[in-house]
Amino acid sequence: MLHKKYRPNVAAIIMSPNYPNACEVFIAERIDIEGAWQFPQGGIDEGETPLEALYRELLEEIGTNEIEILAQYPRWIAYDFPSNMEHKFYAFDGQKQRYFLVRLKHANNIDLNKHTPEFRAYRFIHLKDLLKKIVPFKRQVYRQVIAYFKREGYL
């Protein structure tokens, strides 16, 4: 039996500073794939905890890690890379992720160009519009984590 190899990764569902009064989530468009919108995410370095990786990745990708952690998805959740997708992680079949639900403290601190840019644009959108914007191969994972945070009363 062939075992799949997944890259350890963290992902952030970032609520706007207006949370809980407004249920708007941050999404960003990848710089390398036009029209590919997603939550900020990134690999966990060796010796790093998922929480440490979260703070580092947010600083690298959106220029700020001034967040309030609201909750964490209780398990690792994995997705496979599409077979037709050229990706830079050829040693992996996909990614296994730890999801964090966070609230951004100050939206005006977002700077996509603070480090090497990974995103070309960002926006806050209403939760009900989220899945329409996300690439198809990530939708099931997004559905699952959003449903969990809804059941827990966060969304």
UniProtKB/Swiss-Prot annotation:
InterPro entries: Nudix_hydrolase, NUDIX_hydrolase-like_dom_sf, NUDIX_hydrolase_CS, NUDIX_hydrolase_dom, RppH. SUPFAM superfamilies: Nudix. It comes from the Bacteria. It is an enzyme of class 3 (hydrolase). Residues 5-147 form the Nudix hydrolase domain. The gene is rppH. The keyword Hydrolase applies. Keywords: Hydrolase. Belongs to the Nudix hydrolase family. RppH subfamily. A motif (Nudix box) lies at residues 42-63. GO terms for biological process: mRNA catabolic process. PROSITE patterns: NUDIX (PS51462), NUDIX_BOX (PS00893). This is RNA pyrophosphohydrolase. Accelerates the degradation of transcripts by removing pyrophosphate from the 5'-end of triphosphorylated RNA, leading to a more labile monophosphorylated state that can stimulate subsequent ribonuclease cleavage. CDD domains: NUDIX_Ap4A_hydrolase_plant_like. Its cofactor is a divalent metal cation. It holds the Pfam family NUDIX. GO terms for cellular component: cytoplasm. The lineage of its organism: Bacteria, Pseudomonadati, Campylobacterota, Epsilonproteobacteria, Campylobacterales. Its EC number is 3.6.1.-. One of its GO terms (molecular function) is mRNA 5'-diphosphatase activity.
